[in-house]
Amino acid sequence: DRLRSRGLGDVYKRQMMDRPRYENEVIPEDIPLDIVYEDKYLMVVNKPAGLVVHPGHGNYRGTLVNAIAWHMKDIPDYDANDPHVGLVHRIDKDTSGLLVIAKTPDAKTNLGLQFFNKTTKRRYRALVWGNVEQDEGTIVGNVGRNPKDRMQMTVLPDDQGKHAVTHYRVLERLGYVTLVECVLETGRTHQIRVHMKHIGHVLFNDERYGGHEILKGTHFAKYKQFVNNCFDTCPRQALHAMTLGFVHPV
């Protein structure tokens, strides 16, 4: 019993040591970064799928913010816990692509205003289920929490949720799926995923929104095996933040 208690105590101690000393503390970690551009004011990184952007409940370590803190730890006067520097925007854990990080308070203020005023250019590539018939289009629909499933967002009536606009363009039709380019006019949580589902074209392998269930009921064994192999190759929603345009703050 004594040994068992000591073991539990050791586990509890390790868990407590893994947590930050206070709620918002960022712990620098040596996690590789794919840096696309960097100067003394900002840097742009290509985030891989599967990497959580910001520490939170259950994800105190191993996030993009922890990696940024390590990369910038030798900059004079840099404080990883200063909200006036760091990430300017976010993308989902299982979405890959470009993010801009501000190194100075002035840069973060300037970039933040560009996002607020919707002057940035954000283009995504997405693989969606089905044959998207229109070559291009615009989806307008307020986005908010799904009252039937709080883990999902959904399109809501005009008097609910937040105004959201997504422009899309077909790049290539590939039979059962379509490759599209999506341009965000607004930046709501899960916006592209929700809007594409709203028009009947859920993202390929988007587990949260049913993009992994497309094979249910099919009797075509070879096709089913082929798609399952594709799921193994792309084990997350097929969404990539490909282009990020903004005016340099200096």
What residues fall within each predicted segment?
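Short beta-strand segments enriched for Tyr within beta-sheet-rich domains
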Residues: L111, T189-M196
